[in-house]
Amino acid sequence: MIGYGVCVGPGTLFERTCLPGIERVRAPGSPVFTMRNQRSLFSAYNAMFDQAAANSDITGLVMLHDDVELRKNPAEVAQSVFEDDSVGMLGSVGGSDTVSLAWWNERETRRGRVTDYDKVHDYGSDRYEVEAVDDVILCVNRWTIENIRFPEGHYRGFEGLGVILATLVRAAGKRVMVQDLQDVMHHNDGRGFNGLKDWRHNELRWHREFFDLSPAERLGNHLERLTIPAVPLRLAARRLAMRVGGRSHEVSDGETGDPVIDRLVGGWYRQCTRLRGRMLV
């Protein structure tokens, strides 16, 4: 039996969109685990893994954001994929050669399919092995439920979970796959990040744990970590410079549409590219 897990945020999206979809497709008796009022997606998923592990009838979990609507049952795809014991995790979209939590920047390696708020992201509907998945929806089997946890205190907030979980699964010797999970609809009507400081904290931690860093790079990583609290001040200074320069009306075609944020995140990604080919798993 495959259950469902959702970290529920403020607002009514879960009750209006996500829960009705789960109820429409889930098998009778299949449990739904919810975590509310959470400060970290990582601790929430650890807790749901613990709850699922305590139920010996559960063979897997479908974990999804609270703004995702299921129109068909992804468990049907997951059951087929998890017949292969070498697989520990399945996503809807993902990629490889990943050096950043922004896995989608590796455009040539993107695989899978999901319908987002404004477009269909279609990189192929077959089954593909990847290094990273998007956590908008992901599936794990019993082995992963029992054996994988995010180390306490290592990661925070809500950014980068899919990439980091995929790395943990691969580091434990299991494969990560993506496949079209049958008409998944992501109703996110906005763009951007839930927390830029958490994003960079998690990215730097992930680099320290899973990439071959030189002593100088490791020192630089720690020093940059100390500057993360100043990110809001950096953004404010850039916004002021744009206003003074008469460019406050500008928009970008990046992840957020905000040129100030997109330039900052783009700079982080360019730093990450020097790590290509140096992942340890």
From Swiss-Prot:
Biochemical pathway: Antibiotic biosynthesis; streptomycin biosynthesis
Protein name in the entry: Streptomycin biosynthesis protein StrF
Any GO BP: streptomycin biosynthetic process
One Pfam family recorded for the sequence: Glyco_tranf_2_5
Record keywords: Antibiotic biosynthesis, Streptomycin biosynthesis
Function: May be involved in the formation of N-methyl-L-glucosamine.
Name of the encoding gene: strF
